[in-house]
Regions:
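Long, helix-rich interaction regions
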Residues: 70-132
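Structural detector for internal amphipathic alpha-helices that build alpha-solenoid repeat scaffolds
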Residues: 1-5, 17, 28-38, 61-72, ...
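Boundary/linker segments of alpha-helical solenoid repeat arrays
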Residues: 56-62, 75-76
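Short coil turns that connect the paired helices of HEAT/ARM alpha-solenoid repeats
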Residues: 19-22, 52-57
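Membrane-interacting alpha-helical segments
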Residues: 11-30, 77-92
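Amphipathic alpha-helical scaffolding segments comprising HEAT/armadillo-like alpha-solenoid repeats
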Residues: 8-16, 40-49, 75-79
Length: 132
């Protein structure tokens, strides 16, 4: 009912807002919509932010959509906001340790680690890899 009344940009804003819902299923649905919509740069922080949360299915969805894609814009975003990005990485590890450590005993096999490393450019030392 609403898409007829909203512009393409308004629909993307709608998906960004609902990607922060209290309900994980709603967050996942709207993140999928953002990823399917050829995400504009201004919406990328919503995708990066949701990847530091505890819902494994969302991490899996984002990784599946971004894996094999050109993620240079995501990597640049993360490097330009490195302190915030590093905090999100630490939060993701904390959730792995609390909720998923027994299912994914080896951290390097956990999808969050793969997502942060392959798609967002987090390197082993946690240092900025882009020189300005």
């Amino acid at each position: 009912f609403f898409p007829n009344k909203l512009t393409e940009r308004q629909i993307l804003i709608y998906h960004c807002i609902f990607s922060r819902s209290y309900d994980g299923y709603i967050r996942q649905k709207h993140i999928e919509a953002l990823l399917d919509a050829n995400t504009p740069e201004w919406a990328m922080p919503y995708i990066v932010k949701i990847c530091d949360e505890y819902v494994y299915a969302i991490l899996e969805t984002v990784y599946q959509k971004l894996q094999g894609e050109n993620c240079e814009k995501y990597k640049m975003l993360c490097q330009l906001n490195f302190d915030y990005f590093k905090l999100g990485h630490c939060r993701m590890i904390s959730y792995w340790n609390e909720y998923y450590r027994y299912d994914y005993y080896r951290y390097k096999e956990y999808i969050g680690k793969k997502l942060y490393g392959e798609c967002f450019g987090y390197n082993k030392t946690g240092q900025k890899s882009i020189q300005f």
